[in-house]
Structure formats: C-alpha cells, structure tokens
C-alpha cells in the first residue's frame, strides 16, 4: 500500500499495526502497539509520511516499542542506529524519557552541532512501569507521561560517532532534567 495514500486516509496506523501483528508480537506487546501506533502517526508530519514504506514504518514502530520496554525511573534512554534498510545516508536517534519542557529544542541543538535533522516525531504517551522500570502498559490513566522521540538525522560516520552523540544527548537531557526540577526554587531565589 502506498504510504502517502495511507496517510491521507488515516489508515497507515492500521496498516502498520497489521504488519506488526504478522511479526508474532506477544499479546502484551500487541496491546502496547495498539496504543502507540495512533499516537506515533498523529505526530508524523504530512511531508514526512513518504519517508518509509508501511513495512519500514512497522520496523521503526516495532523497534521503538522494543526500546521502550526498559527505562530506569528518572532517566532518559538514548540510542543511535544506522540501519541498512532505511533511507541511505540516515541514522535514527531515539529517546524515551519523562515528559518535560525543552526536550526537542535541546536534542535539536545538540544534533545540529554536527549533523542535520531530517524528521522529528515526538509522541507523548502515558506509560505504566514496575519498580524496576519494565514497561507494563501504555495508555490509560495509570502511569506517567513519557516523551518518545524519533529523529532521522544525517548518517553517523561510525560507531564512535554514534556513541559520542549518544553521550552528548544523555548529558544535555540530564541538564534539562536538573533545570526543570529546580526551576521553582531558582525562580523563588530570583524574586
């Protein structure tokens, strides 16, 4: 199915979900995908929908769902991938963290020091996790809002550049977390 047509008639999330079902997801992961797919594609810009085929989008969504399965409380998880089957010349930067202000701007600034950003997809989903950080469910009212960020960027040259970018993003997000957590105290001190 043509991804542009699918995006126009709002069926792409259903098509991608069907692709994920073919992959034999567990019932728990399938329930997560049913919540995540609409949230993810609601944040895909119309001009970006053509970047991938439905099968490629399913790989992106499935990969993100797998990546989201474990996250320590109060910490961001970050990865940089350069999959062979994506657009030539692109790497994927993916981040899952507590939802808070300044995330996209901060990550974009770090990336822009050496690479160009081609697409940003940023759904916010309610995630319920156990004490060890394992994902229990998505959606509903239990849990807390988490930012799931998917950046398509210029291809990182090698594993060393991927690791360097990952470390820079992690450090910047720790600074954001500290600033957001301290803003009220800083404001009170300034007044």
Regions found by a protein language model. Name each.
Residues 2-191:
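Non-catalytic interaction/regulatory segments
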């Amino acid at each position: 199915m043509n991804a542009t047509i699918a995006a126009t008639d709002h069926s792409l999330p259903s098509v991608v979900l069907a692709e994920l079902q073919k992959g034999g997801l567990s019932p728990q992961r399938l329930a997560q995908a049913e919540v995540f797919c609409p949230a993810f594609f609601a944040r895909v810009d119309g001009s970006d929908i053509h970047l991938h085929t439905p099968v490629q989008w399913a790989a992106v969504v499935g990969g993100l769902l797998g990546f989201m399965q474990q996250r320590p409380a109060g910490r961001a998880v970050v990865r940089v991938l350069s999959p062979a089957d994506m657009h030539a010349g692109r790497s994927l930067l993916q981040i899952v963290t507590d939802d808070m202000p300044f995330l996209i701007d901060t990550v974009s600034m770090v990336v822009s020091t050496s690479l160009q950003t081609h697409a940003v997809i940023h759904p916010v989903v309610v995630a319920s996790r156990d004490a060890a950080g394992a994902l229990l469910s998505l959606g509903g009212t239990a849990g807390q809002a988490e930012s799931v960020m998917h950046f398509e960027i210029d291809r990182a040259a090698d594993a060393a550049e991927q690791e360097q970018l990952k470390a820079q993003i992690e450090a910047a997000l720790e600074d954001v977390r500290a600033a957001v957590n301290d803003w009220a105290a800083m404001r009170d001190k300034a007044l």
